[in-house]
Amino acid sequence: MSRFKFVDIGINLTDPMFRGIYRGVQKHQDDLQDVIERAVQIGVKKFMITGGNLQDSKDALHLAQTNDMFFSTVGCHPTRCDEFEKNDPDHYLMELLNLAESNKGKVVAIGECGLDFDRLQFCSKDTQLKYFEKQFELSEQTKLPMFLHCRNSHAEFLDIMRRNRDRCVGGVVHSFDGTKEAAAALMDLGLYIGFNGCSLKTEANLEVLKSIPSEKLMIETDAPWCGVKNTHAGSKYIKTSFPTKKKWENGHCLKDRNEPCHIIQILEIMSAVRDEDPLELANTLYNNTIKIFFPDM
């Protein structure tokens, strides 16, 4: 058994890729169980399955109910906030609230919510701002921490966060790729910073990682997305590799599909960049996560 313990705070296990389906076409057999097994082998103890909208949150919860290690989030991603307006916004919010309220114990966070100004083609700035703020009602009512998203929107994100900070018990800004100053401002609000492959692309990203105290960090894969590519600045620190094929083969990882087992690679990059003992850092990351998302453990 692995000497490491991990909570993958951001894992998209409802993604059809883990069922062998790519762009609606079945390319290989459903291998979700193998994916989970590989992750458990390297020490993943809990998987926080991300909910990206109402339906996705229902699917994430449904999956979470199949395994004691699975948990989920309830919320609406900034790029999908149009859904509030396509429906009755209050009713949509109420459905999210009911889903979270009636499944405490499995639902451990409100999210994924926040702002994403890199992808305004999916949802306008005004709509994102409005429904990010609206979702604080969910955290306020449920007393659950938030799983937050901030892309190219730091000033507006901070503004909304500051205004509503007393309405949420805390949370993490996941997949962080901002500046040292941005990280410091978020930490000033008592928020944690989540790192995955997308957070480790450039030397500047690595410098930001060094600047954050370990007791404010969390770790994630965001799989099947955000894998560490060879072109990423962090990739040179990876020690652990997995048997990987370009075409699916039983018992192997698939080249362009990130998996939760790759969380060990994120740890290796983080500990090398920060010059910290990997086991010590892993324990700190694990304890940070338990404190915020699993306080009754």
UniProtKB/Swiss-Prot annotation:
Cofactor comment text: Binds 2 divalent metal cations per subunit.
Binding site for a divalent metal cation 1: 112, 222
EC class of the enzyme, as a word: hydrolase
EC number: 3.1.21.-
UniProt-annotated binding residues for a divalent metal cation 2: 112, 149, 174
Region forming the signal peptide: none
Subcellular location(s) of the protein: Nucleus
Residues the record lists as N6-succinyllysine modifications: 27, 46
Record-linked PROSITE patterns: TATD_3
Superkingdom, natural source: Eukaryota
MF (Gene Ontology): 3'-5'-DNA exonuclease activity; metal ion binding
Entries under InterPro entries matching the protein: DNase_TatD-rel_CS (IPR018228), Metal_Hydrolase (IPR032466), TatD-like (IPR001130), TatD-type_Hydrolase (IPR050891)
GO cellular component terms, semicolon-separated: nucleus
Cofactor (UniProt): a divalent metal cation
Keyword rRNA-binding annotated: no
Entry-linked Pfam families: TatD_DNase (PF01026)
Family matches, as PANTHER family: DEOXYRIBONUCLEASE TATDN1 (PTHR10060:SF15), TATD FAMILY DEOXYRIBONUCLEASE (PTHR10060)
Biological role stated in the UniProt entry: Deoxyribonuclease which catalyzes (in vitro) the decatenation of kinetoplast DNA, which are circular DNA catenated to each other, producing linear DNA molecules. Plays an important role in chromosomal segregation and cell cycle progression during eye development probably via its DNA decatenation activity.
Family the UniProt entry places it in: Belongs to the metallo-dependent hydrolases superfamily. TatD-type hydrolase family.
Protein name: Deoxyribonuclease TATDN1
Organism of provenance: Bos taurus
